[in-house]
Amino acid sequence: MTETADAMQPAPNEAREQWTELAEEVRQHQFRYYVRDAPVISDGAFDTLLGQLNALEEQYPDLRTPDSPTQLVGGGFATDFTSVDHLERMLSLDNVFDESELRGWIAKVEQETGPELHYLCEVKIDGVALNLVYENGKLVRAATRGDGRTGELVTLNALTINDIPERLTATDEFPIPTLLEVRGEVFFRLEDFAALNASLVEEGKAPFANPRNSAAGSLRQKNPAVTARRRLGMICHGFGRMEGFEPASQYDAYVALAAWGLPVSTHTSRVVGADAVVEKMKYWGEHRHDVEHEIDGLVVKVDEMSLHRRLGTTSRAPRWAIAYKYPPEEVTTKLLDIRVSVGRTGRVTPFAYMEPVTVAGSTVSLATLHNGSEVKRKGVLIGDTVVLRKAGDVIPEVLGPVADVRDGTEREFVMPTHCPECGTLLAPAKEGDVDVRCPNQQHCPAQLRERVFHVSGRGAFDIEVLGYEAATGLLEAKVIGDEGDLFSLDAEKLIEVPIFRTNAGALSANGKRLLANLDSAKDKPLWRVLVALSIRHVGPTAARALAGEFGSLQRIREASVDELAAVDGVGSTIAAAVVEWFSVDWHQQIVDKWASAGVRMEDERDDSIPRNLEGLSIVVTGSLETYSRDQAKEAILVRGGKAAGSVSKKTAFVVVGEAPGSKHDKAVELGVPVLDEDGFRRLLEDGPDAVAPTDLDVSE
């Protein structure tokens, strides 16, 4: 009785002040995480703060109000998207952080339900929650979690995610329910995240720090086309309101979802008892980087649905599920210095030089800080102890300083005003840019070195022997003045470079290999030439599109901005950069030098391949048996067609393979002809007239 009476005593003023400060701090971090997608502390540090707030409210229950951060899922902050109420609340999950806590939760559950339950063990995806509502099998809305009761409407954006079907597929075993509210996680597959960051770097933009933040930002784009280009994925893992669907277990529900065409995880296991759950927890802790996406824990759920109702929920989380959180992949290290480097397009980038530290299985001593504004935003000083995060193969990121351990010896980083390599005054390329650049593009030693090295890259001429050391050696020995001289190198010139000369004064084996590689590179396809020219924003994807459309460097040079921008996959920014590049005299001199040395400046047309798709826009969706996605696109391009990424009224055909997603439905809606793989093959061989009416599936 005494304990109960004490618990009901009102909180003293000191406790109320502590609660106010702590609640405000938690709200600020929720805002940074859920709204700005830019957290400044680790998940572990946030969990600690929330735990302190929760403990204070446990001690003084009158502090726990409905608007307390402990009672809200995700903070509930307003954004630009239309608000929509969920049919049933989207709850969060309570967390445990070690084996004893996990076993304690299982013991508590089984004390109420009986021993040896079936549990589902699901990898916890580090992504963004999404709520889908299907009525009679059709997706009618998609919304973010928001505060758990109200989210943001993102239906158009969700429809661009290939994993999310616009219509469910009925089966004899699993009829379509009249109403299905299903929850899941939107995420980046690691290879897609790496490709996105590579393209951003190609365009001179700062890469995303981690897949979770970029998934959130990509889903919440005002323009759904941007979301579509980001290649997001989704996995379903929970349910809200359901009508006409009463699964006996969570496992059975997942089987039905998969049958209807909804994405479910292939990493889920059904086990019995605490020992088996702990075994799975340890297994995924050791194999968390073997998964195609980032995971930050293991979700354990009681499998039987009737027990869900029996166990019930708290105000924010179900009692029948728990999240075991793995230790965050963050460490602290000393920031020894911040230095800048000058890239091939003149962009000046500050880098953090740190005491080497092991994180996520690799040793890290260097991390980009992107630009001077980012250094200020993070608030790091030279000499700081900083928090470094690296998950799997993701780019290491300095999250911020540990300010409490500063001793006064730290100093502020000052972005240079002049190029550290050539002394030229730095300036942004255009007003409003956060990046500064060295405008001395032709003669800056750093830019020269980076451009020569870039020529050898796998996306350009792919010359293995021409590494960074070789590029530096060639320039320092003055056997080349710029990248334009590379293909004019011969043995007599190369022997003047120390790294290509033997002790006996002869040309080294690597020197001979370099000459052979340069000679074979002259016959590489046009798109590789375009990439090698270091035109800003032009990476392999845009280069392939331009080469496929125009066929020769001369035609690309003569094209207008509008003509270039009309090419699928190019757009106005890249088009303007191409026109600007060719307007510079010394750029043209590089092209002329390469052409004089025998570098191929146009793609030879294979006369055996008909140009029978000239001007036709064709979309390929789903998996084809005899063509990879790239092979299918290449087959369209060489026949004069355009391999488009989205369906519109201008689309001539949509080619459908396995698991096509919403593009098939869009084609049907617009009346665009749909071809299976056999129809696609006939289209390639004999053109659109050869596609018989029976090949045009517009009925489904």
Curated annotation (Swiss-Prot):
SUPFAM superfamilies on file: BRCT domain, DNA ligase/mRNA capping enzyme, catalytic domain, Nucleic acid-binding proteins, RuvA domain 2-like
GO cellular component, one term: cytosol
Residues given in the record as Zn(2+) binding sites: C419, C422, C438, C444
Domain BRCT: start-end pairs: 608-697
Pfam family of the protein (one): DNA_ligase_aden
Catalytic residue positions: K124 (n6-amp-lysine intermediate)
Reaction(s) this enzyme catalyzes, per UniProt: NAD(+) + (deoxyribonucleotide)n-3'-hydroxyl + 5'-phospho-(deoxyribonucleotide)m = (deoxyribonucleotide)n+m + AMP + beta-nicotinamide D-nucleotide
InterPro entries assigned: BRCT_dom, BRCT_dom_sf, DisA/LigA_HHH, DNA_ligase, DNA_ligase_AS, DNA_ligase_CS, DNAligase_adenylation, DNAligase_N
Cofactor(s) of this protein: Mg(2+); Mn(2+)
EC number: 6.5.1.2
Chain residues that bind NAD(+): D43, G44, A45, F46, D47, S92, L93, E122, R145, E185, K301, K325
NCBIfam families given in the database record: dnlj, PRK07956.1
Described purpose of this protein according to its UniProt entry: DNA ligase that catalyzes the formation of phosphodiester linkages between 5'-phosphoryl and 3'-hydroxyl groups in double-stranded DNA using NAD as a coenzyme and as the energy source for the reaction. It is essential for DNA replication and repair of damaged DNA.
Name of the protein in its database record: DNA ligase
Species per Swiss-Prot/TrEMBL record: Rhodococcus erythropolis (strain PR4 / NBRC 100887)
Name of encoding gene: ligA
